[in-house]
Amino acid sequence: MTARPHLASLWLAASLVMPLAAHARDAGANTFYGVGAQYDTTHVYVAPDDVDKFVASFLATFGGQSTKQVVATVTPTPSSTTSQLLQTPVGTVSLFGFKTPIPYPFGAERTGYLVTDIDAAVRAAQAAGADVLVSTFPDPIGRDVVIQWPGGVNMQLYWHTTKPNYATFETIPENRVYLSTERADAFTRSFLRFSHGKVVSDDPRAPGIEIGRVEDSFRRIRIESVFGKMTVLATDGHLPFPYGREMTGYEVKDLNDTLAKARASGATVLVEPFASDHQQSAMVQFPGGYVAEIHAAAK
């Protein structure tokens, strides 16, 4: 007879605790780990001999400045690279010129996203469907991890020991992700769950001129989140060069003026300007091989 009041009290305690636990899980699921688009960088790897040429051309094209170049180990296994940030009004590049062979899988990650709590961010990414390719490791200024989203999209998350303070962009660049038609939905769901972003548009018949195939169409998904803009291009993989090689699209005020600066600084215009989706776009290759999409609003 004395067991019943005891069981009742346990049930009451559990009923009070369970909603709190559920609330804690929900709060964790809704935590924003991103900081802002100005803290997200495109990772660019060039040969050491091309580093200075790339820096000069990229900054001459977009403006901005470089941080001091350092030589460091930025991988968990032994390696050596020059490292610097190119900070422009339209996007930031993390530039690496490896003096040693590049340890796997470095060089395949597209971007680096600053997060407020790297351990919690990794757990959130895994819960959203990402794999951890390189577990968290220290670097000279913080900690890093390399993850992979459904569809094979590699990304680095990083955290700084000293909180950085960067100026906001004049225009926010777009992370351009090429995926198979079969994996586009899985990637989008996974990334949205992690980033708490939103789909701005989902066009199942976007103009094929945007991927170099004038007579065809493809699916284009535009996403916005605290990490900035992302464009998912779901295709059959039949892409003429250089489509699929670019990782970032940079928005500028005057496309023709920007292309003139690019040419004058040693870059090559691979695709001349074309009009689509209310903007003018072109493709440029900088010294060292980095390919970028550049666009401006149609006038």
Whereabouts are the PLM-identified features?
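Bacterial N-terminal signal peptides that target proteins for export
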Residues: 1-10
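Bacterial N-terminal signal peptides
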Residues: 9-19
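Boundary at the C-terminal end of the N-terminal hydrophobic targeting segment
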Residues: 22-29
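Core segments of cupin and vicinal oxygen chelate
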Residues: 33-36, 43-90, 135-150, 177-229, ...
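Vicinal oxygen chelate
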Residues: 37-49, 84-85, 98-124, 143-148, ...
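A cross-kingdom feature marking solvent-exposed beta-strand/loop segments within repeated
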Residues: 69-82, 94-119, 126-144, 162-166, ...
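Short beta->alpha transition motifs characteristic of CBS
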Residues: 158-163, 294-299
